[in-house]
């Protein structure tokens, strides 16, 4: 796990360095916003030298730029939001109106080529059914997937 975190950290540093053309350890927020907008629209993002240069390098309270630690937090918050969205999409595949029931789990597993009996599905659900209502709600599903 630690190795994975080191690799992620190295990757974040590499991406940050691509934005930080002036090598001042800061990236302007407007540069990041332009790049994100370009990615969303399918265009190629252009990072100018001027975008990444702090006009006054002595000034350490520039709230219009991000240092590496801020950049990492921003990326990781985005990753968490993506994980939550992915979990919701996965949950929708299994759920009936009230949540994942043994019947809906059996149906989905069957579609995935993993046939289980209704009793097997009841046992699987009981392992993560925190409130013991026989149904997996989204919060229980999230806990199960972590």
Swiss-Prot record:
<dbReference type="Pfam" id="PF13833">
    <property type="entry name" value="EF-hand_8"/>
</dbReference>
<feature type="region of interest" description="Disordered">
    <location>
        <begin position="44"/>
        <end position="65"/>
    </location>
</feature>
<feature type="domain" description="EF-hand 2">
    <location>
        <begin position="116"/>
        <end position="146"/>
    </location>
</feature>
<feature type="binding site">
    <location>
        <position position="131"/>
    </location>
    <ligand>
        <name>Ca(2+)</name>
    </ligand>
</feature>
<dbReference type="GO" id="GO:0005509">
    <property type="term" value="F:calcium ion binding"/>
</dbReference>
<feature type="binding site">
    <location>
        <position position="133"/>
    </location>
    <ligand>
        <name>Ca(2+)</name>
    </ligand>
</feature>
<keyword id="KW-0106">Calcium</keyword>
<comment type="function">
    <text>Potential calcium sensor.</text>
</comment>
<dbReference type="InterPro" id="IPR018247">
    <property type="entry name" value="EF_Hand_1_Ca_BS"/>
</dbReference>
<feature type="binding site">
    <location>
        <position position="129"/>
    </location>
    <ligand>
        <name>Ca(2+)</name>
    </ligand>
</feature>
<dbReference type="InterPro" id="IPR011992">
    <property type="entry name" value="EF-hand-dom_pair"/>
</dbReference>
<keyword id="KW-0479">Metal-binding</keyword>
<dbReference type="InterPro" id="IPR002048">
    <property type="entry name" value="EF_hand_dom"/>
</dbReference>
<dbReference type="InterPro" id="IPR039647">
    <property type="entry name" value="EF_hand_pair_protein_CML-like"/>
</dbReference>
<feature type="domain" description="EF-hand 1">
    <location>
        <begin position="7"/>
        <end position="42"/>
    </location>
</feature>
<keyword id="KW-0677">Repeat</keyword>
<protein>
    <recommendedName>
        <fullName>Probable calcium-binding protein CML40</fullName>
    </recommendedName>
</protein>
<feature type="binding site">
    <location>
        <position position="140"/>
    </location>
    <ligand>
        <name>Ca(2+)</name>
    </ligand>
</feature>
């Amino acid at each position: 796990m630690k190795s994975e975190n080191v690799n992620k950290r190295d990757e974040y540093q590499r991406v940050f360095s691509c934005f930080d053309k002036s090598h001042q350890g800061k990236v302007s927020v407007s540069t990041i916003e332009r790049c994100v907008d370009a990615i969303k629209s399918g265009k190629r993002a252009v990072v100018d030298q001027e975008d990444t240069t702090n006009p006054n390098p002595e000034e350490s309270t520039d709230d219009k730029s991000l240092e590496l630690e801020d950049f990492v937090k921003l990326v990781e918050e985005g990753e968490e939001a993506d994980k939550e969205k992915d979990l919701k999409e996965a949950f929708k595949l299994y759920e009936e109106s009230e949540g994942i029931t043994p019947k809906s789990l059996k149906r989905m597993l069957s579609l995935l080529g993993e046939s289980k009996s209704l009793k097997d599905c009841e046992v699987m659900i009981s392992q993560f059914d925190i409130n013991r209502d026989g149904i997996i709600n989204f919060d229980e599903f999230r806990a199960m997937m972590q």
